[in-house]
Amino acid sequence: MSMVYINIFLAFIMSLMGLLMYRSHLMSSLLCLEGMMLSLFIMMTMVVLNNHFTLASMTPIILLVFAACEAALGLSLLVMVSNTYGTDYVQNLNLLQC
């Protein structure tokens, strides 16, 4: 396994650990999720290019489309929560809270 794959895997793990540790604010959670998607995109692109998978060449582009949709929904949720409650705490997203 080359050093590039190890670095990208470590970037994914660091983003996952950031998502698990800093989950009180919605903005930091969205940023960690974007880091995970970016490292996953780079890893998929490198695997497709190195192994010459012609049938799977569209897979990284499809992942980017889903990442863009996730980012748009996350930012709209962030704007809605910050306009409603004044903060971006994740605890405000609990629908069962009275």
Curated annotation (Swiss-Prot):
Source taxonomy lineage?
Eukaryota, Metazoa, Chordata, Craniata, Vertebrata
One GO term in the molecular function aspect is: NADH dehydrogenase (ubiquinone) activity
* Name of the featured protein: NADH-ubiquinone oxidoreductase chain 4L
State where the protein is found: Mitochondrion inner membrane
* Source species: Acinonyx jubatus (Cheetah)
The yes or no answer to whether the keyword Coiled coil is present is no
Similarity-based family: Belongs to the complex I subunit 4L family.
Q: How does it assemble?
A: Core subunit of respiratory chain NADH dehydrogenase (Complex I) which is composed of 45 different subunits.
Does the keyword ATP-binding feature in the UniProt annotation? no
Q: How does it sit in the membrane?
A: Multi-pass membrane protein
State the superkingdom.
Eukaryota
